Regions:
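Positively charged n-region of N-terminal signal peptides that target proteins for export
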Residues: 1-4
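Conserved functional micro-motifs across diverse proteins
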Residues: 19-208
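Bacterial N-terminal signal peptides
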Residues: 6-16
Length: 208
């Protein structure tokens, strides 16, 4: 029996909010630009550029994410912050930038983007309904003004006119640290239906 991606993300987020299991030691995933379909990699930033469009994806740490949420959404409490007593957070965060360089519109659907693990688990970026429902499932009150999180995350269809750009966060719940590899698939659609996409690949660093 297969479950909807949104339902899987909701359950995972609820566990992250409530009492996600802490791995014995830190697990590090390094970018792997050697895979077919990978974007261009510079540091932690993946990208794909053309005369018509550009897409950028940057993995960010907890401090950077919290600062971005505070600046964009005006929330003092980051809803994705590390649970007290845990050394690492229950979420993965990426900054995404989409730019339309063409003379026609560009459509970007965040829910069509995916995180996929080597275990063939899939999840879409978290949206506001999933975040709110997760707090309810964890029997925790949602932060005051949580609806303003939409100012920080890319939530819902984005339509860019010529020359426009949009940026925001993709937030995914953390997966089992036994996973060996994962990838983020990012795609936009140009007016004539042409796809514009790349993948960001990561592999677990071997312990010495």
């Amino acid at each position: 029996m297969r479950f909807p991606v949104a339902a899987i993300a909701l359950v995972g987020l609820a566990f992250s909010v409530a009492f996600a299991k802490q791995p014995a030691g830190p697990v590090v995933y390094d970018p792997d630009p050697t895979r077919p379909g990978a974007g261009k990699l510079v540091g932690e930033t993946w990208s794909k550029e053309s005369p018509a469009a550009s897409l950028w994806l940057t993995r960010i740490d907890e401090e950077t994410r919290t600062g971005f949420v505070r600046r964009r959404a005006g929330l003092e409490l980051d809803p994705f912050m590390t649970t007290p007593g845990r050394k690492t957070g229950g979420f993965l965060a990426f900054h995404v930038l989409v730019e339309n360089r063409s003379e026609t519109r560009l459509v970007f659907q965040p829910q069509a983007c995916r995180l996929q693990t080597s275990w063939k688990d899939f999840q879409a970026p978290l949206d506001l309904p999933t975040i709110v429902a997760a707090f309810a499932m964890a029997d925790r009150p949602e932060p005051v003004g949580i609806e303003r999180i939409r100012e920080a995350i890319i939530d819902g269809e984005v339509v860019l006119r010529p020359g426009e750009r949009r940026d925001g966060l993709f937030i995914f719940h953390a997966f089992d640290p036994a996973v060996k590899t994962f990838q983020i698939d990012v795609a936009a659609t140009l007016t004539r239906g042409e796809g514009f996409a790349f993948s960001a690949f990561y592999k677990k660093r071997k312990k010495k």
